[in-house]
């Protein structure tokens, strides 16, 4: 079946991982949708495996906080998946807020709880998302009237639906220049403010935020046996340490680690681990959380890529150490690079964490590299029994920077001690020691947070608002 003659006001939103994504209005119903179109060429061996996985998964998923797939159209050589269009993705929503910071009670906690509710549903059905990041989480913004009507305590039995989205999967985790593939991004030339942005910036009363998890192109069903999972999953900044070690059998905890990184980003507007490559990413984890031991990460040596990754990260750390005979030198270099990377006036700002001086690097070099005595202390500690894995001194950091970094970024002020506890439980080295999605929903930081329950009503309102916007009534 073809989309020809079924849609009007068709606009290209961007290019997803496996095809083009468009926005259009159904002529018969007036419903505004996003549709992802893939073309299978004669050179292909068939429909891409990721597309098959996404179609199969989405056809079975029905939940308030998980994208709904409306329809799949087959018109050889094209395959078109029809989704509901959301207002924006979480990354863009955060960028729209003052100083890119979210209010803890009216924004951050409700968003966080709904994401965990979505993950609880997915994990309960043996689905591992494998690419959790702000670009794959979607937001519908509803005004105070809608909020007052629908804000009720959450129930474990929720059965709604909505959006889909994507973004790119670049190595450093940067957003695609095209923006999100199912959330429209007005160009500067349009110069208009969308209805959701007006609602988001109202000061009269809190809005209702409805959150959806999307983009299941990398998802896996846990019960289906496979020879080995690819470790090239989860955009680098949100990738768990076990995936960095090339774990072949990772499961639900990879999503939980990503949630810890997303949580921190919502609280501070900064990326938690902004490594330029996998070796630097692991080093930053060791700085923040302390180097792993047999107690904190008992399964570390069971992963196929552990030894190679440790060797590579050790070399990267040694290069940094050579630069810091005087510990201030490296920090000064970092600050100079940050100033040089500042966007020119009139250009689009990049992520705040990529422009601001790297606080984690500054703290690490002040504690671990600043003086010969600091490095000598590390050498002595690395030779002690505490270093149960006998890690090289370049990778041995026995005094975690977690507490200092939470204070330096004001994360501890933004989220309270209970929030810090939830964050830390997401960021455990050992996968089985991480909090589960079901446990997170009932964590003291989230347990009493109300979430929207008017699922089908939101679908109707979302479609109506987007249709009116399309025909310039809003």
Swiss-Prot record:
It comes from the Eukaryota. Pfam families: Pkinase. Phosphorylation at Thr-17 or Tyr-18 inactivates the enzyme, while phosphorylation at Ser-230 activates it. The modification Phosphothreonine is found at residue 17. One of its GO terms (biological process) is cell division. Coiled coil: none annotated. It catalyses: L-seryl-[protein] + ATP = O-phospho-L-seryl-[protein] + ADP + H(+); L-threonyl-[protein] + ATP = O-phospho-L-threonyl-[protein] + ADP + H(+); [DNA-directed RNA polymerase] + ATP = phospho-[DNA-directed RNA polymerase] + ADP + H(+). One of its GO terms (molecular function) is cyclin-dependent protein serine/threonine kinase activity. Gene3D superfamilies: Phosphorylase Kinase, domain 1, Transferase(Phosphotransferase) domain 1. The modification Phosphoserine is found at residue 230. Its EC number is 2.7.11.22, 2.7.11.23. Its main location: cytoplasm. Residues 150-200, 334-356 are annotated as: Disordered. GO terms for cellular component: cytoplasm; nucleus. May form a complex composed of at least the catalytic subunit CRK2 and a cyclin. Serine/threonine-protein kinase. Involved in the control of the cell cycle. Required for entry into S-phase and mitosis. Probable component of the kinase complex that phosphorylates the repetitive C-terminus of RNA polymerase II. Belongs to the protein kinase superfamily. CMGC Ser/Thr protein kinase family. CDC2/CDKX subfamily. This is Cyclin-dependent kinase 2 homolog. It comes from Crithidia fasciculata.
